[in-house]
Amino acid sequence: MWQNIIFVGLGSIVGGVSRYFISEWSRHLFPSSFPWGTFIVNIAGCFLLGLLSGFFTSHPALVYRLFFTVGFCGSFTTFSTFSFENLQLLSNKAYGLFSLNIGLSLILGILFAGLGYLMTNK
């Protein structure tokens, strides 16, 4: 158990630092009001989580899977997990749950982000 926690933590450190560097790099490379850094890490994270999930299907080394998928991708972007879970819902033909997850996540995510902002910036 502790070994798994350590691997998730180490992956999280690497993922979070990677996200920071990519966000800073993109801010200098693409100066605009569009959030390029977030966009890049979210799309790259989705691709990476898809690759890793496919790889670990045939190479089920738990600590490495935890390091890369839960730790790295989890701190690099949570959008990757959201996207992959929706892909699984589509694969299972759970179209109602797919629609519900996307709709509620987007609407409630924006509402709660706004609520949190309003609570701290009156």
Predicted feature residues:
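Membrane-interface helix-loop junctions in multi-pass transporters/channels
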Residues: 1-122
